[in-house]
Each structure stands twice: as structure tokens, then as C-alpha cells.
């Protein structure tokens, strides 16, 4: 069994305590990762702080060269990393390899986008007469140490979406991968290390949340926190962060609104793809369908047909539905299913579970008193909610505590735009499934779904400070 190590100040280091990582597929032991202590976390933070001045002093072109090398290494090793990723988080092997390739593309784009983040010169004369002799040079400077905390569901891509923009902007990074997904995260770190990233610029921290979780968030050396995960943890990070800037990508209860004039066959295909990709373990998964009563029967039948085509089983067979991340997650999802059954939702698909493998469930006649109408399952469960009007559909969608994304299916462009304006979410997809990306697009949530705007350009800007240097020219 492989004993993985943390990258700290350019060296691979073990810890006295370790965490064994098991595959959600079959409980195979995949290896161990270090369980760092607070003292070891301090050492990593100190290394990052010491490395900051030299890294910040490099030109964007010099920093970009390291990112381009890293991207090339990821593409070279995509099969190896993708195989580990598939085992570690039970993701289909094709999708796992695709995640590594997408990550290489993201890192390249970040390297190039960093070259386009330039300053500006401003004259003061346009404001008041007394300021006509003033000239400002406005620059963007790195914030310092960025703490990047990634989720299990995209342990390579959503890690790099934080790391690459931070690095190209001149920041140094403390990377905390998810426990389940930490091996994949450390393989990403290995690519940066092989690319020659200077010692201390990129460091990793693995360990138990009870030991180092709050500690690294509150750490005095951290200047910016970039987190993807659950809303309760995100809210806690917000409280612990104090006055420091944060970027939070949190939960969602993304709704697909289906209007009477929609192409129902197209809508059904998009909804099922959006709901059940990676077994629904995506913050951007469609998690409820809100449909006009007049077309609900037909849509329900079409959705049932599409769900019946999904395959269930092993990620290495590229099954559509694979085991969820752990038994605790499966138990939570199962609780939502049982609650819906007890309250007389109509199951349109067989309900079956084997350990942490759940068959896809489609419920019709879901009402407001059912938990599945409101809670994020993070699993293969999709409720259909029938409404009498577009206004009711919008109100139901907006009643959620979350505000990540929505889809609207209609052939009326004007109506689609009007609805999009009224939905309290960060992104609205018209006649398409909810999804993250392309990675250069802005990605954000409102309400309980997050804080700050991601997307490569937006992430770079978020992880920099604006400095204005003002001259009196006469």
C-alpha cells in the first residue's frame, strides 16, 4: 500500500499519524495520507510566507511558464491520475480521465489569462478642477497566502480552479484536499512539483478536520480562503474568517422549470443528464423539476423513459450511476426517499439500495411538505413538482434557501429572459441542463449557495488587491 506524503517547502514529508483511504467502490485500501498536526501546519504556513516575496516578484510570464509545464504533465499522466481518481471517489473512468484533461486546459487558460490582468493609468482632471494635476497608476497585487479547500466530487478540477488563478496572480498556496480525494489532490501537487514550482510556493495539508480544520482557517498567516463544500461548513468558515476575504462555493437545489411550450423530449434528456451525472453528487445537479400541470404527465413519462436507460454499477464499466461517496451519504439520501414515500410521493422507478450504491429514483406528485422538495440530496434522486402557473413555478424555485443555478425550458425567448431575471440564482441556463462552466464563465451562487464570483478571470481578480499610486505631476 502506497504511503503518500505532503508537499511542504519543496519536499515530500510524512507525519507520525496517517489516514487510510478506502475506495467507495469496494472498500479497497488505496493508500495512506499524512494526518498533519497543528505544528506541522505552522511549518507549512511559515514556508509559504517565506516564499511569497520572490514568487510575487516574478513576472506573470515567468509564473505562467510553471503552469504550462504543470498542464503538460497532467495530460501526460491523465490515465494514471484518472484511474486513481475513479477509484477514490467512484467516478466513471471516462469522466475521471476527462476531469484531468479539463484541468490541464483550465491551468493553461489561467496562465494566459494572468497575462491579460493589467493595470491602468487614470487622470484626475475629469473629477474636479483641483485634481487635474493628479495621475494614478492602478495595479493589482497578490493578496498573499491563499488557503484552497477542495471538495471530493472534483478533487482535481475544483482544486486547480482555486490553485491556478491564485498562483498566476502572484499568491502562494496552502492546499487542503478533501480527505476522500486527497490522493488525487496530492497527485495534482506532484505535477506542480515536477514542473519545478519553487519551494514553499505550493504546499499541501492533509489531516483530520477535528485537529487542523478550524486551526488553518483561523491561522494568522492566511490572507484569503477559497472553499468549495457544504453550506453549513461554508457558514462556519465565514464566521471564523473574520475580516479576511473569502470565496465560497456551497450547496444548491437547482430547479428545472418546464413551461407549456417547451420541447419536452429535449427537456427530458437534458434534465436526466443534469440530474444524474456522477450519481447526482454535484452542487450544480438538477435537484427538482418544476413543471406546468398541463404538460406534467407527458414530461413525467419522458423522464421515466430516460431514467430507465441509465446503467448502474462499477465506475470502471462507465456506469451512469455508481456508489455514492460513503454510507453516511447513502443513509441521508435514503432518508429523503423514505420521507417522500411516507408522504405519498409517486415513485416512477424501482427503489433499490445495496450499501452505498443507490438506484436512480424519480418521484412524481412531490409536495411542499416533503423533505426532498427542499433538501439537497447529493445523490440520484429527482422530484417532480407540479404547478398551475409560471408565477407559481418562480415562487417555488425562489423559496429555496439556495441560489446556485436554474434551468428554464421554453421556446419563447422573451419569456425565458423575463423568468431568468426573476430567479434568485447566480446562473440561469435556457433549454439546457445546469452545469459549471465553461471554466472561463463566471460561476457564483447567491443566498446559501456561496459568496464571491469564480471563473478564471474572476478568480484572479478576487485573489488580488487593487493598489493606487497617485502622483502630482506639477
Where on the chain are the PLM-derived regions?
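Short, well-ordered beta-strand elements within core beta-sheets of diverse protein domains
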Residues: 30-36, 51-57, 147-148, 256-259, ...
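Residue-level signal for inorganic ion chemistry
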Residues: 27, 63, 85, 107, ...
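Conserved C-terminal structural/oligomerization subdomain of aldehyde/semialdehyde dehydrogenase
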Residues: 28-32, 222, 257, 311, ...
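A short hydrophobic/small-residue beta-strand
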Residues: 172-174, 347, 427
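ALDH superfamily catalytic-core signature
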Residues: 232-367, 430
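Rossmann-like NAD(P) dinucleotide-binding subdomain of oxidoreductase/dehydrogenase enzymes
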Residues: 75, 124-266, 387
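N-terminal Rossmann-like NAD(P)+-binding subdomain of aldehyde/semialdehyde dehydrogenases
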Residues: 1-132, 309
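Terminal low-complexity tails and localization/encapsulation signals of metabolic enzymes
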Residues: 1-32, 65, 69, 117-147, ...
Amino acid at each position: 500500500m502506497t504511503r503518500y506524503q505532503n508537499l511542504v517547502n519543496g519536499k515530500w514529508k510524512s507525519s507520525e499519524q496517517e489516514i487510510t483511504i478506502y475506495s467507495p467502490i469496494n472498500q479497497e485500501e488505496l493508500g495512506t495520507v499524512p494526518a498533519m498536526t497543528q505544528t506541522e501546519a505552522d511549518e507549512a504556513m511559515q514556508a509559504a510566507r517565506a516564499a511569497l516575496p520572490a514568487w510575487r516578484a516574478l513576472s506573470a510570464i515567468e509564473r505562467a511558464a510553471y503552469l504550462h509545464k504543470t498542464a503538460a504533465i497532467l495530460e501526460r499522466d491523465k490515465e494514471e491520475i484518472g484511474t486513481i481518481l475513479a477509484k477514490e471517489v467512484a467516478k466513471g473512468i471516462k469522466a475521471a480521465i476527462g476531469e484531468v484533461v479539463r484541468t490541464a486546459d483550465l491551468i493553461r487558460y489561467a496562465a494566459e489569462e494572468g497575462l491579460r490582468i493589467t493595470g491602468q493609468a487614470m487622470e484626475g482632471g475629469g473629477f474636479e478642477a483641483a485634481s487635474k494635476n493628479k495621475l494614478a497608476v492602478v495595479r493589482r497585487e497578490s493578496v498573499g497566502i491563499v488557503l484552497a479547500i477542495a471538495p471530493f466530487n472534483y478533487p482535481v478540477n475544483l482544486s486547480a480552479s482555486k490553485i491556478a488563478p491564485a498562483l498566476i496572480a502572484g499568491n502562494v498556496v496552502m492546499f487542503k484536499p478533501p480527505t476522500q480525494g486527497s490522493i488525487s489532490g496530492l497527485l495534482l501537487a506532484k505535477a506542480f512539483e515536477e514542473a519545478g514550482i519553487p519551494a514553499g510556493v505550493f504546499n499541501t495539508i492533509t489531516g483530520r478536520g477535528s485537529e487542523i480544520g478550524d486551526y488553518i482557517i483561523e491561522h494568522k498567516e492566511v490572507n484569503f480562503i477559497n472553499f468549495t463544500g457544504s453550506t453549513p461548513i461554508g457558514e462556519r468558515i465565514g464566521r471564523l474568517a473574520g475580516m479576511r476575504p473569502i470565496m465560497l462555493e456551497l450547496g444548491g437545489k437547482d430547479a428545472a422549470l418546464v413551461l407549456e411550450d417547451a420541447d419536452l423530449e429535449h427537456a427530458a434528456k437534458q434534465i436526466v443528464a443534469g440530474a444524474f451525472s456522477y450519481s447526482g453528487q454535484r452542487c450544480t445537479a438538477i435537484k427538482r423539476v418544476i413543471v406546468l400541470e398541463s404538460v406534467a404527465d407527458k414530461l413525467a413519462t419522458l423522464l421515466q423513459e430516460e431514467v430507465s436507460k441509465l446503467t448502474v454499477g462499477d465506475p470502471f464499466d462507465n456506469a451512469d450511476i455508481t456508489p455514492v461517496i460513503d454510507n453516511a451519504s447513502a443513509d441521508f439520501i435514503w432518508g429523503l426517499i423514505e420521507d417522500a414515500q411516507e408522504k405519498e410521493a409517486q415513485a416512477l422507478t424501482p427503489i433499490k439500495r445495496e450499501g452505498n450504491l443507490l438506484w436512480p429514483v424519480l418521484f412524481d406528485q412531490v409536495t411542499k411538505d416533503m423533505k426532498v422538495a427542499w433538501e439537497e440530496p447529493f445523490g440520484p434522486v429527482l422530484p417532480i413538482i407540479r404547478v398551475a402557473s409560471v408565477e407559481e413555478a418562480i415562487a417555488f424555485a425562489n423559496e429555496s434557501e439556495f441560489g446556485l443555478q436554474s434551468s428554464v425550458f421554453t421556446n419563447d425567448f422573451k419569456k425565458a429572459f423575463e423568468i431568468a431575471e426573476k430567479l434568485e440564482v447566480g446562473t440561469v441556463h435556457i433549454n439546457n441542463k445546469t452545469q459549471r462552466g465553461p471554466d472561463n464563465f463566471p460561476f457564483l451562487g447567491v443566498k446559501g449557495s456561496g459568496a464571491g464570483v469564480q471563473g478564471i478571470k474572476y478568480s484572479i481578480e478576487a485573489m488580488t488587491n487593487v493598489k493606487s499610486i497617485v502622483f502630482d505631476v506639477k
